[in-house]
Amino acid sequence: MKHWQPITQFLLKLFLVGSSLLFHAFSGSAQSWQQLLSELSETEDFEHTSWEDYEEDLEEWAQHPINLNAATREEMERLPFLTPSQVEDIQAYVYRYGGMKSITELTLIPSISWYQRQLMEHFFYVDADQKKSDFPSIRNIIKYGKHEAMGMLKVPFYERKGDTNGYLGYKYKHWLRYQFRYGDYVKLGVVGSQDAGEPFGAGKNNLGYDFYSFYLQVKKLGRWKNITLGRYRLHEGLGLILNNDFSFGKLSVLSSLGSASNRIRVHSSRSSVNYLQGAAATYTLLKGLDLTAFFSYRKIDATLSDQGGIRTIMKTGLHRTVKEIAKQNIASNTLMGGNINYRNQGWHVGATGFYTSFSLPLTPNQSQLYKRFAPQGNNFWNASVDYGYVSHRWTIAGETATGNSGAIATLNAASYLLTDHFSLLALQRFYSARYYSLFSNSFSEGSDVQDENGAYLGFTWIPAHRWSITGYSDFAYFVWPKYHTKQSTQCWDHLLNILYQPNKRWTLGTRLRYKEKAGTTTGRWRLYATFAEKNWSTKTSVDYTVSKEMGEKSSQKEADDANPSQGYLLNENLSYRWHWLRLSGSFSYFHTQDFSSRIYAYEPGLLYQMSFSSFYGEGIRCALVARSEIGKHLLVIAKLGSTNYFDRSHISTGLQEIATSHQTDLEIQMKWKW
């Protein structure tokens, strides 16, 4: 492809000088918390997680910040970028000096980095009043509660093959949500969601939308810390037996280790999978002693075996074709259990247990090696013990679990703050090949908490003011063959991330990652520069990826002779704020040899829609987001995104195939508050 060479040269020059051609008419920062958090996080952490759910939680927090002088440990530990030790330092400072007078006093706490302070300004404010408010009266809840109605419509300017023959619905995606809330005490809402291609108001969707979620949550009602009805998510312990909430990857664990792990969250997202339906509640028996109970009954999608059992539990949430609808709500699942945990002077210990059953037996195809130890039958149970300790220097956390398989899974980690600017984290996990839990989600290299032995060593270092260096090295060994393998495999994963902020406007960063797994070696490198003013911000980045697939039985010579797959991406993000209008734009040029050298990039999106996309092949991606706050009640956001490929005549395959080399979408979102 000769035509891309002049484009490459031009864009490379743009990268070298683009960050200098900026407006300097203002002072301050225009960076959003999403941009700041994306620079502290590892993009690939979000490939296998539902970032939308956690982003929604943080966005609501940013809209309703908390008084830092009155914030509880549990509230602060909800933030993914604060460690439990840092939370201890903040609370110790507030206690010692009788509260903060300004958010800038965070600079007096050595363990809080510059980037963390910038993020905290989005979620906290400082008020001298440190009194804890009593639960409001019903009259005040009704009178002073806040309402909001939201809607989103996505319009594609193209047709997929299934739109004309295959999908039973139209090509537009849309959703609606109503929510009522009173501070952090009461939250009530209902969501209706429709994916593109799903029938609206027809067939099984005679009530309109394909998916509805409803929820009611009451917090801080005397000894009742949390009462949640409807659809919700749970996170108990470190997730070895129960976590259908959000979890972070290997880089973010450096800050999230040991954070409050017994959480009940409402399921207010548009995702039609990975939620519980029923009731959950946490009650304080004694000071530091909490009891949680939960019950869930819900329908699930599944494919059936010839014997009528469940072959596979479907988690796509898509019901567009006759075949997909035939799998909809074909079975049911019941879950009941509880957790008890005790906290005192930095120590905590807890126990979790549950029983779950299916209306049809699980019958996986165990003739396939990687499914040899998959759960089978109707009824299952799991139990675990979690434990830990938090002080200024030490953070210790662990969980050990078992179940009706009789096998063991254990995860243990310890973090030590050698100085106020340097900390080490060591983590060990052993997940037996015979162990399973149908609701687990925890730290792992693989996709499941099963068949993995590993050790992880990470560090966080602030060598000087405005510097931040983080990194890790992780080793994992898989005894049993995985998908597409026939023997034991192992994985080495190393990452180094460096941030430098020479002044209040500039931020420079680089990230290096090297990974060997199942015969594939992948190296990734990123270099970026961010410049922020009061009304302007820009981020320029370059990504490079090289990947080599050697195969399980390749000799060393064959491995050395193998041609690597390479690729790069040049990206520019710009944002501008003027009174009631905020504009954000993103432009990317990518060129990779194949999917193995794909590259990930962040681009601005709508509310509750932090976007991390992957690109491979050759092409450009452009996105423009306009956000307008009209008065005190109406918010309108529009996003126009377009991808143009230079190396293909069509996009995707099957019913998702687009018969052109480009695709453009328009998304419109509106929120009315009163």
Q: What do the PLM-derived regions correspond to, one by one?
A:
Residues 26-65, 130-144:
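N-terminal, intrinsically disordered low-complexity tails/presequences enriched in Lys/Ser/Pro
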